[in-house]
Amino acid sequence: MAEFTNMLMNPWVLHLQKLELELKCPLCLKLLNRPVLLPCDHVFCDSCVHKSSQVESGCPVCKSKHPKKARRDLRFMESVISIYKSLNAAVSVHLPQLQIPNDCNYKNDALNNSNSPKHGESEDSEMTDKDVSKRSGGTDSSSRDGSPLPTSEESDPRPKHQDWTEKQLSDHLLLYEFESEYDAANHTPESYTEQAAKNVRDITASEQPSNAARKRICGDSFIQESSPNPKTQDPTLLRLMESLRSDDPTDYVKAQNHQQLPKSHTEQDSKRKRDITASDAMENHLKVPKRENNLMQKSADIDCNGKCSANSDDQLSEKISKALEQTSSNITICGFCQSARVSEATGEMLHYSRGRPVDGDDIFRSNVIHVHSACIEWAPQVYYEGDTVKNLKAELARGMKIKCTKCSLKGAALGCFVKSCRRSYHVPCAREISRCRWDYEDFLLLCPAHSSVKFPNEKSGHRVSRAEPLPKINPAELCSLEQTPAFTKELVLCGSALSKSDKKLMESLAVRFNATISRYWNPSVTHVIASTDEKGACTRTLKVLMGILNGKWIINAAWMKASLKASQPVDEEPFEIQIDTQGCQDGPKTARLRAETNKPKLFEGLKFYFFGDFYKGYKEDLQNLVKVAGGTILNTEDELGAESSNNVNDQRSSSIVVYNIDPPHGCALGEEVTIIWQRANDAEALASQTGSRLVGHTWVLESIAGYKLHPVIG
């Protein structure tokens, strides 16, 4: 059982010795005390690097220069050292015979002439050796005054033959040889112990001691009670065993160099070995925590003495959590214009995977392409086959090679129609340039320098729609068209959620009555043509709400059919939409009549503050609606507080706090209720503090859709 335990613990002893070497300071050769990381990635004790900096500034190993403020404390290394001490103590309890004593039975006079501990010994090793000596019965290999004990075979009290112990310790030495051969085969950096084991192989291959002598050497290396006859042992192997007993495994290498080289060569070679081994040990030690060190360098607050402030860990965790929150946010960036902003000029954000539109949680997959509807609509080489987008990836790759003339960012796939012109734009950037000209039929653009150039459809008159041939016009209808009132030429049509057939019908109507089609809302629109369901209700879109606020006609697609049938625009009132899908009634008619009589706007005199989280772009649309309705936007809580202080004597406050009542995307049912409830509580606290009224964002939409103020809380 004891033999099995020893065989099981041998790897632990080997790796603990390796770990101890990695945790030692290259200067004092003791376990790191308050470890400090230099910019060159070398680690030393705080006191050692302080003493070294008084002699020469810079790293003692690589000699690189650095200011004192660039040093970083490695607090986690102290925890690693503490764990190592606990592991070493646990192994010492269960396997005391494998502990390497501090002093050797046979000291070479040329190597050690003093009784004091060596320079590289650590306090932990001394304490461990004392404990082992006590457990071994209080006998030590040397006397109290430091002189060696008698070494003759007659004075050796132990039995001469301990087969199981010698076999076990011989296996332990073979384990050293196996580890060294494995590291050499895989080209890994060798530690101090592995280098010593490698030297053992070279010596034993040349001198070839007997098996009995090898067993005595191994037994004497790890058992304190053993005291073999020095006459039967090779002195070179004895020096190796002495180095293994000490805390500095390079003693054997140094002794061998002293024996073979002159003094000057010995000093240079030992210094080189020390520098190389120390740098390799520090490099291996810092491979894993290098990323953590970089985070600490970026986030921790450094005082004038180069010490980390007490709250650096808290600040680091806060910054990491903020970065994670920002990374996991639901913002998607357009592949063309490199912007996440959603506005009327950009259109909604669309998401495509392999040419097919996706929604929900699928939009955050790695293979999904995000583009604005306007950007993909005006991309020259992108086209549709049904609902599938073709050539999108190739167009994105082409656009990423072209810089925008306005913002100098890549992704400008839309170029000027003039072939010799090298100007290219993002679609949102081009819309901000008033002198750009647009062809909404062929999706062509003219830059300000070539705005006088004619589009193809302007050279040969209005082009017939490719989607559907125009109905034949007989001479009688042609005469009626000539007699059409002049105001029909000023028709500006804007479709809202129309089907493909309704879009073709609107194009035919525009050609027939010389009307203009606007794909986006603008104040010049005269008719908003919206699709309706079987009940005659329309979808509540931004175009419909803007049309209501501006007093425009909000009509259904039947008006276009009736106008084409009558060969002239018919009266719009019978086709005016009365209700939307949310149940709000008579909003378009009420708004239109009030606009005709120049009555105050819907939100005249009201001031709105939008509180909390909103989807990017959606909040801007809400604020634009409020402005068009006559309301005022308060951008900060300070402005809200100042407004409430001005209206202290007013019984009815004019300031309104608006919060988002839509649940976040992708949340479970229980989480949605909790989040919305928390938003309402926070908004209510702000409203009560400033004396404002509190509403959800749907209150704004419903008031506009019905063109009347709904009841307000508070």
Curated annotation (Swiss-Prot):
A zinc finger (C2HC pre-PHD-type) spans 331-382. GO terms for molecular function: DNA binding; ubiquitin-protein transferase activity; zinc ion binding. One of its GO terms (cellular component) is nucleus. It comes from Arabidopsis thaliana. The gene is BARD1. Residues 106-165, 254-283 are annotated as: Disordered. Component of a DNA-protein complex on WUS and WOX5 promoters. Interacts with SYD. Forms heterodimer with BRCA1. The keyword Nucleus applies. This is BRCA1-associated RING domain protein 1. A zinc finger (RING-type) spans 25-63. Keywords: Developmental protein, DNA damage, DNA repair, DNA-binding, Metal-binding, Nucleus, Repeat, Repressor, Transcription, Transcription regulation, Zinc, Zinc-finger.
